[in-house]
Design a protein with these regions (language model features):
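Short linear motifs at protein or domain termini
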Residues: 1-99, 207, 211-215
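An acidic, carboxylate-rich microenvironment
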Residues: 12, 36, 78, 127, ...
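Mobile beta-alpha loop/short-helix "lid" or hinge segments that flank ligand
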Residues: 57-62, 155-157, 172-174
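Alpha-helix N-cap/N′ positions at the starts of helices
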Residues: 66, 89, 113, 175-178
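Conserved amphipathic alpha-helical segments that form helical-bundle/coiled-coil interaction surfaces
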Residues: 103-165, 177-185, 194-204
Length: 215
């Protein structure tokens, strides 16, 4: 029986910093002073530095040992570029995942569980968006192209952050619940073409919202 390792102090600090960055409490460009943050969170500098290294690897923090750390800046152009990358990769990964998992009830169960967790997430927006990412990750989990999945995971946290921009500009005309239910339904029924179409439309709509904010 495999047990899940207990969270470390670095894990706890990582989660706190991540949430504050994603929710905008720590603004783009804000300095992240190890001593100040360690005192604020009641931890030693060691787990703080480890958390900063992790966040830097994900692109959420700009960190250099001799120059200190700052919250990474995020331009609208960066967000648009990332959504274009998602459009190129994620529909392909989703289609391959569903075809590979055809007839396997464990895949359907995992996707349903991730969807239920997404629906129950909150109250913070960062928690909701993290669960949203978890749902999308479950959908693509059976993709046999592991380099593609690795690339998608590499930009996942930046994508969560940029979703804040799309959420802030949302007009209310989109029925996101319906979009995600359609993704769930297509995936668990093994309808790869339908799922790819829904995801493509979903990503294009989010990209359009980002571009609309620039007008």
């Amino acid at each position: 029986m495999t047990t899940t390792p207990a969270p470390t102090r670095a894990d706890w600090v990582d989660a706190r910093l991540r949430a504050e960055i994603l929710e905008g409490t720590l603004a783009p460009g804000a300095r992240l002073v190890v001593g100040d943050l360690a005192e604020r969170y009641g931890v030693s500098p060691t787990p703080l530095r480890e958390a900063l290294r992790r966040l830097a690897a994900e692109g959420l923090v700009d960190w250099q040992p001799q120059r200190g750390a700052r919250v990474a800046t995020a331009t609208r152009r960066d967000a648009e570029d990332l959504y274009e990358l998602r459009l190129a990769l994620e529909p392909v990964a989703l289609g391959q995942s569903i075809v590979t998992a055809a007839g396997d009830p464990a895949y359907a169960d995992a996707v349903r569980a991730a969807y239920d967790a997404f629906c129950a997430a909150g109250p913070g927006l960062a928690d909701v968006l993290e669960a949203h990412h978890g749902f999308h990750a479950a959908l693509m989990a059976r993709c046999p192209n592991r380099p593609m999945v690795t690339a998608i995971e590499r930009y996942a946290q930046q994508s969560v952050r940029f979703q804040m921009l799309a959420t802030a500009g949302r007009s209310g005309r989109r029925d996101l619940d319906a979009e995600h239910r359609a993704l769930l339904d297509a995936a668990v029924r093994g309808r790869a073409d339908d799922a790819v179409r829904v995801l493509t439309e979903h990503l294009r709509a989010s990209l359009a919202e980002l571009r609309a904010r620039a007008d």
